Amino acid sequence: MPSDAASSLRHADTDENVFRRNERVLLLAPSQGLGGGIERYIGTVEWAFADQKVTSQRVDLNRSGLRAHLKMLADGRMLLRASPERTRLVVGHRALMPIATLLAREPTVSGMSVLCYGDDVWNERLRPRRRIERALMRRPGVRAVAISGFTAGTLASDCQSTILPPALSQKWFETLVAASAAVQDLTPVTQLVTAFRLEDWRNKGLPQLIEAVRAQHRKDIRLTICGSGEPPPDLLRLVSTHDWCSLRVGLTDSELAIQFASAALFVLATRTRIGRHANGEGFGLVLLEAQVAGTPVIAPAHGGSSDAYMDGVTGVAPVNESAEALATAISEMLEDPARLASMRRHAAQWARESFAPESYPRLVASKLL
């Protein structure tokens, strides 16, 4: 059933630049250990390089501020100067473009690829920093790589881009599939799950999701919030007021996979905004993870998540971002057990076929090197 654009991309042009595998890569990453879709995406790119026997080294920006940026620059220069090999810079976030541009002056650097996601692209473009990033991305030797067609379209007024849709590493993929097989019978409790970096709980639409669950007036529904990072006090207060709501922090991959596989529905209710405090999903990798685990999804009403599921087949999206629209989407799914069971089967089949990890490393090499 893999007929969507993301699946087609996965099998297109996989031989392009295949003979450039011996090129070394220096990966500039915006964080490590903070969790979230961007970190998972970058980790999968690292796995793909290793699979293709591309030498890859990584430098992380673990803190904000000038000192941390200068340290990243110094660490990058040290690694580049330690080897005479030709090196491609892979920039894990466009905010790191100033550092990458300085590193590109090193004689061993042979161009760069910059990964673009969602709100990093449609944030307020008139801010001085955004103007600088946009100018740097237009320089010769810079290749913009978007996570989805939606993000690529948003980038179009800034620069041309290619698309590298997300996928899952072989190990993570197999963990999710195994969790699906291990969960044989759903309990009488109707489990809903959402997952995100906990500091982003408002942007991920948790208040609207909680209100939508309350509107179901069903005693059998439970909502589990899986997250990484330290939970903010206001989030803890919100969760504590609902005995059907629980918070699971810092789960291992195996534990997270079981949460996905055990759920009747996975819900991602991300809010979409443009401007100075932009927010939104460029793809929604966690939607793909849930479907590989065999769970149908409710996706954000707006943004780039349409590439991450098959509408009406493996999941749905509410008509808008209101709690009322989300409540309607949830109730329509839960009140039709036959449809929900069909979606579970199709979610697993579609996600595992369309995003099979075997072909992804070659695609990464062709798009980034």
At which residue positions do the language-model features occur?
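A conserved mid-protein helix/loop that constitutes part of the nucleotide-sugar donor-binding site
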Residues: 40-44, 199-215, 233, 324
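Donor nucleotide-sugar binding/catalytic pocket of nucleotide-sugar-dependent glycosyltransferases
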Residues: 139-182, 187
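Conserved donor-binding/catalytic core segment of Leloir-type glycosyltransferases
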Residues: 182-204, 210-214, 224
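Nucleotide-activated donor-binding/catalytic signature segment of Leloir-type glycosyltransferases, i.e.
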Residues: 233-260, 265
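Acidic donor-binding loop of glycosyltransferase active sites
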Residues: 261-280, 295
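Short hydrophobic beta-strand element within catalytic cores of glycosyltransferases
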Residues: 287-292, 296-299
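Conserved acidic donor-binding segment of nucleotide-sugar-dependent glycosyltransferases
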Residues: 310-323, 332-338
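A short, well-ordered alpha-helix in the C-terminal region of glycosyltransferases
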Residues: 332, 339-354, 360
